[in-house]
A protein has these predicted regions:
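A residue-identity detector for tryptophan
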Residues: 23, 65-68, 97, 102, ...
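Aromatic- and glycine-enriched beta-alpha-beta binding-site module
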Residues: 68-165
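General "foldedness" signal
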Residues: 44-46, 55, 77, 107-109, ...
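N-terminal domain-onset segments
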Residues: 1-75, 218-222, 230, 237, ...
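Interaction-surface and assembly-scaffold signal
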Residues: 2-15, 121-266
Length: 266
């Protein structure tokens, strides 16, 4: 018998790209929120998912940079930082499914293979990219301080092309780090059929939310965001119409599994 949460499966499971659940995360999040054309968001949603109602801010978007450390329950990655650390940049919108309001990731890039495969298991549409973000410091002048006037920046590139860049100038402490990414995630997992006939071998609607969440003090400020064209990306279709604000916060959470809401959706 072979074991493993992902390929390659072996007798021991040690070669699997993904370690066993649960996964524990600690990281810093730089969030930029803005409004775009709701019809552009609608174009990114499956047929069984609808836009939020007009009074639920259907054009709201969160563009988030994250600098993560993540380990499995036995902490094996703590002694091997290359498997512990990764960065990602992702775009979150809100949507309605079965008369409930959800958050949903429509684009996401990561810089490690295990992070990409982990996302595919969870229904995140992860792709590989180059993700960079500035880190707050508490000593010296080699980085921004978490104080009024502190500037935090993030960049995203893929296939040698700059896709996005953001800057947040802090104003002061805040109660939260935005609102768009504050709901349970609704994702569609799928696997195209090997017959290449346009059908799927796997089609599921799933949801997930972290447990054992710990949050630092959030900071808010003024945000700037630029998106750039690429022949293989569609970020500019959801370009900002109105900037809402920027945020920084440290987050700790655990992913112990999700829930299948529907199989073979129409």
């Amino acid at each position: 018998m072979t074991e493993g949460l992902s390929f390659p499966r072996t007798a021991t499971g040690r070669s699997s790209i993904l370690p066993p659940l649960p996964w524990h995360y600690s990281g810093d999040l730089l969030t930029v929120e803005y409004r775009t054309d709701p019809s552009a968001i609608r174009a990114l949603l499956p047929d069984d998912v609808s836009l939020p109602r007009d009074d639920e801010d259907p054009g709201a978007v969160a563009f988030i940079w994250a600098d993560w450390q993540a380990c499995s329950d036995d902490g094996r990655e703590l002694d091997d930082p290359i498997r512990l650390q990764y960065k990602e940049a992702f775009v979150v919108v809100r949507c309605r499914w079965r008369d409930q309001l959800w958050s949903r990731c429509v684009f996401i890039w990561v810089d490690k293979d295990f992070a990409m495969v982990r996302g595919h298991l969870q229904g995140y549409p992860k792709k590989l990219g180059s993700v960079q973000m500035s880190r707050p410091v508490t000593v010296g002048r080699g980085g921004p301080r978490l104080e009024p006037g502190g500037r935090l920046s993030g960049t995203l590139a893929a296939y040698d092309r700059r896709l996005a860049q953001a800057r947040v100038t802090l104003r002061g402490p805040a109660d939260a780090n935005g609102f768009v990414n504050g709901l349970p995630m609704l994702h569609h997992r799928f696997l195209s059929s090997i017959e290449a006939d346009g059908t799927d071998s796997l089609r599921e609607v799933v949801t997930m939310r972290g447990v054992d969440v710990e949050l630092s003090q959030a900071w808010s400020g003024d945000a700037e965001l630029e998106l750039f064209d690429s022949p293989v990306e569609e970020l500019t279709t959801i370009a900002p119409r109105e900037m809402l604000g920027g945020y920084w916060r440290s987050v700790g959470t655990t992913f112990a599994g999700g829930q299948t809401l529907e199989r073979d959706p129409a």
